[in-house]
Amino acid sequence: MPRQFPLEKTRNIGIMAHIDAGKTTTTERILFYTGKVYKMGEVHEGTATMDWMEQEQERGITITSAATTCEWRGHRINIIDTPGHVDFTVEVERSLRVLDGAIAVFCAKGGVEPQSETVWRQADKYRVPRIAYVNKMDIMGANFFNVIEMMKERLGANPVAIQVPIGKEDTFKGVVDLLTMKAIIYVDDLGKVSQETEIPDEVKDIAEEYRIKLLEAVAETDEEIMMKYLEGEEITVEELKAAIRKATINMQMTPVLCGSSYRNKGVQPLLDAVVDYLPSPVDIAAVKGFSPDTGEEIERKTSEDEPFCALAFKIMSDPYVGKLTFLRVYSGVLQAGSYVYNSTKNKKERVGRLLQMHANHREDIDAVYAGDICAAIGLSNTTTGDTLCDENHPIILESMEFPEPVIQVAIEPKTKADQEKMGIALQRLAEEDPTFKISTNHETGQTLIAGMGELHLEIIVDRMKREFKVEVNVGKPQVAYKETIKKSVKVEGKYIRQSGGRGQYGHVWLELEPLERGGGYEFVNKIVGGVIPKEFIPSVDAGVQEAMQSGVLAGYPVVDVRVTLFDGSYHEVDSSDMAFRIAAAQAFREGMKKAEPVLLEPIMKVEVVVPEEYMGDVMGDINARRGRIEGMELRGNAQVIRAYVPLAEMFGYATDLRSKTQGRGTYTMQFDHYEEVPKNIADKILEMKNK
């Protein structure tokens, strides 16, 4: 089956926003107007099509990014729905990696909220061109122009209005298109009927003012338009569209539209803008990767004639078909039933079926082409971030980096039957989500699960119960502390066993050095002249990493250390991988004790929004929680306090904040970095831990 839509008529887009900006409702409306859904779902009724996991429907938030395909004006639009809650930033990163463009949805009242900033920065990192949609124009306090100012101040963006609203709050009834200088007024409730009219008198002045701003902004990015503008010549709508498209794709501007998805106003012009201004796979630079054999950089252009390569960006377990692997195809063609090569894992896999995902049903397809997004069944070894390619033309695409989990809880199965199923459930969930980690506490034998926040772990436990029918008891949340060192040391490790027959001999000299925060782990091999044979070097590395799982202070994982192997010796007969692993692990533990080990704790970036009168109490409380206040600003009539606070001090904060502000304060927090724990606090933690 040849490709249905040419590449230039394909759009891979994400919809990104803060919780409650109305992202899921906007997606729903897009599916309704493009004819994929016949009755609209409402989030607060729990029937929205994109929120297809049961918990999402209960909580009214979007957790997993479902990929959906729809059509508009002869274009295929693949939508990746991204979650807006801070515990799920990894889902957002993961979807941005495979998108070509995005719609950023803002609430007309809240404007740029903390999560919007995070998501915006993530989109900057992956250089994703975007258009902005100011939603909820019908609610009290809606202010379109205020949101544009906030986008400039907070995001450092260059927002350019291509519409202005007609009316606001309950009088919001349509928009002025600043390209055609015509008004679009919505007549019926479903928003399917709209009239194009002359601009009403009450918005004429503001429309004129913003039309000039639009022309000036476009002229800055396009010389031809600049000349025409300065000479007072007529600029056609087509010329303007082409210039805005170019500037958007080059990240020079963000076109801004407005509407009210819930009231069905403004969604069709938003779809037009996706087609008019967001890039197709052809407009995006060739994807870069490297050869697994030589390590040199390779490019793959978005074309069916290039060798096949794709990125697995999401794994999901589906009750009917088992494991679904979502793929973004960058080049070439993949047929259902064919073999692919997983270059990340160095394994061949067979693709059983290929599915095109619609919001609530799926269709089997024979093949996928460069630029497409699909789900594959049958890839048992593939995990998130793996590259799939043609075996004769191997390439590894840059993988995604995922943050380390910051919070953990102990869980235990309620019954013997649960125990057997628990392992399988945890393994499946960890496959889907790289920020969810499982470990065992060797002293107590407890299973620990770690994630990005309390909500993240609650949802994991909930899914175990619903999808895998596993009941577990959950302990109190604990902070995921880490250990590191403060000074450099050189240390020797020897492991020698002689007792009849073949002995064991491993001998290493290591240097341990501290790295800056977030430096992770580096292993440097400085062995010269073969004092330790090449084949034992990986064992030394493995031994060190094994020892790093459990630090010398309190058994927490060790981070931010460079380990250099600079000397040692071996025995012709007795040396083995195991002997070098043990010698390296012993040396590391010994060295760490001498290198001034310290505890590290996760520091959260916290933003608290409170009415003015509670300001003093709330700030006092943040200081009492060892918080560092970074800054304050007025937002509307509320004060926003930005601070860095250790996660250990944030448990139960929601309840405290509610009681201090009579339920009027809100806060968001997300992991920012690790920092050394003050000595007096560290002593208490170690005392508790080592009891």
Curated annotation (Swiss-Prot):
GO terms for molecular function: GTP binding; GTPase activity; translation elongation factor activity. Gene3D superfamilies: 3.30.230.10, 3.30.70.240, Elongation Factor G (Translational Gtpase), domain 3 (3.30.70.870), P-loop containing nucleotide triphosphate hydrolases (3.40.50.300), Translation factors (2.40.30.10). One of its GO terms (cellular component) is cytoplasm. Its main location: cytoplasm. InterPro entries: EFG_II (IPR041095), EFG_III (IPR009022), EFG_III/V (IPR035647), EFG_IV (IPR047872), EFG_V (IPR035649), EFG_V-like (IPR000640), EFTu-like_2 (IPR004161), G_TR_CS (IPR031157). The keyword GTP-binding applies. This is Elongation factor G. HAMAP family: EF_G_EF_2_B. It comes from Caldicellulosiruptor saccharolyticus (strain ATCC 43494 / DSM 8903 / Tp8T 6331). Keywords: Cytoplasm, Elongation factor, GTP-binding, Nucleotide-binding, Protein biosynthesis. One of its GO terms (biological process) is ribosome disassembly. The lineage of its organism: Bacteria, Bacillati, Bacillota, Bacillota incertae sedis, Caldicellulosiruptorales. Residues 8-282 form the tr-type G domain. GTP binds at residues 17-24, 81-85, 135-138. Catalyzes the GTP-dependent ribosomal translocation step during translation elongation. During this step, the ribosome changes from the pre-translocational (PRE) to the post-translocational (POST) state as the newly formed A-site-bound peptidyl-tRNA and P-site-bound deacylated tRNA move to the P and E sites, respectively. Catalyzes the coordinated movement of the two tRNA molecules, the mRNA and conformational changes in the ribosome. It comes from the Bacteria. The keyword 4Fe-4S does not apply.
